[in-house]
C-alpha cells in the first residue's frame, strides 16, 4: 500500500489479495478454496480532483454450495445494484470514481468532504454459461471523513434493475 492518505487517498496504489480454504468437517466432499484480489489506483488530475479506479475479481474452486460463490453487487463492487445481486464461480469488476475532495474545518468537525461520480461494471461466470452479459451501474454521491478517522459515503446508483441509495463506512484498523 502506497497512498498519500490511508482514509481518503487522492494518489497512490493499493493491492489486496486473499486466499481461503474451507473444509466441511461433517461432509468431507464439501471443500473449496476462494481466491480474491483487487488493485486500487488513485490518480490526481488537478488539486482536489482525482480518479479512483478499482479492478478486482474472485474465483472459487472445489465443491462450494451456491451461497458460498463470490458475489457482485452493492457498494463494494457494483453500485446501482442491491448487495450480492449476482453470484458465480468467477467474478470480475471495475469501479471508476471521479472525486472532488476538500478539507473541511468547522466548530463541529474537521476532516474531508467531497462529491463523487461513478461508473461501475462487472460480470459473473458459471460453468456451461454463455451469456456474455456485463452489468453496469452509474451515479453520484457525497463523501465525508470526519476527523480523518473513518470514511462515509452515500451514493445514488442507477442500473437497468434498480436505483438504490447505498451507504458505506470504511475504517482502517
Question: Which ranges hold each PLM region?
Answer:
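Outer-membrane beta-barrel transmembrane domain signature
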Residues: 46-48, 89-106, 114-139
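Internal helix-turn-beta structural module
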Residues: 134, 138-150
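Hydrophobic alpha-helical segments
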Residues: 99, 103, 124, 145-149, ...
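Residue-level detector of the transmembrane beta-barrel scaffold of outer-membrane proteins
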Residues: 14-16, 50-54, 95, 114-118, ...
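Solvent-exposed loop/turn segments connecting transmembrane beta-strands
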Residues: 23-31, 86-90, 127-133, 156-168
Amino acid at each position: 500500500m502506497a497512498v498519500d492518505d490511508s482514509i481518503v487517498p487522492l494518489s497512490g496504489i493499493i493491492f489486496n489479495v486473499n486466499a481461503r480454504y474451507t473444509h466441511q468437517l461433517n461432509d468431507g466432499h464439501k471443500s473449496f478454496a476462494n481466491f480474491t484480489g483487487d488493485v486500487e489506483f488513485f490518480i490526481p488530475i488537478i488539486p482536489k480532483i482525482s480518479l479512483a479506479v478499482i479492478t478486482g475479481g474472485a474465483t472459487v474452486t472445489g465443491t462450494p454450495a451456491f451461497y458460498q460463490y463470490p458475489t457482485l453487487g452493492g457498494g463494494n463492487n457494483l453500485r446501482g445494484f442491491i448487495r450480492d445481486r449476482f453470484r458465480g464461480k468467477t467474478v470480475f469488476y471495475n469501479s471508476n470514481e471521479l472525486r472532488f475532495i476538500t478539507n473541511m474545518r468547522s466548530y463541529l468537525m474537521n476532516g474531508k468532504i467531497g462529491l463523487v461520480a461513478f461508473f461501475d461494471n462487472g460480470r459473473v461466470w458459471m460453468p456451461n454459461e454463455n451469456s456474455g452479459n456485463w452489468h453496469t451501474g452509474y451515479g453520484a454521491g457525497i463523501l465525508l471523513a470526519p476527523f480523518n478517522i473513518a470514511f462515509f459515503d452515500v451514493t445514488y446508483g442507477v442500473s437497468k434493475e434498480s436505483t438504490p441509495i447505498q451507504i458505506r463506512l470504511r475504517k482502517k484498523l
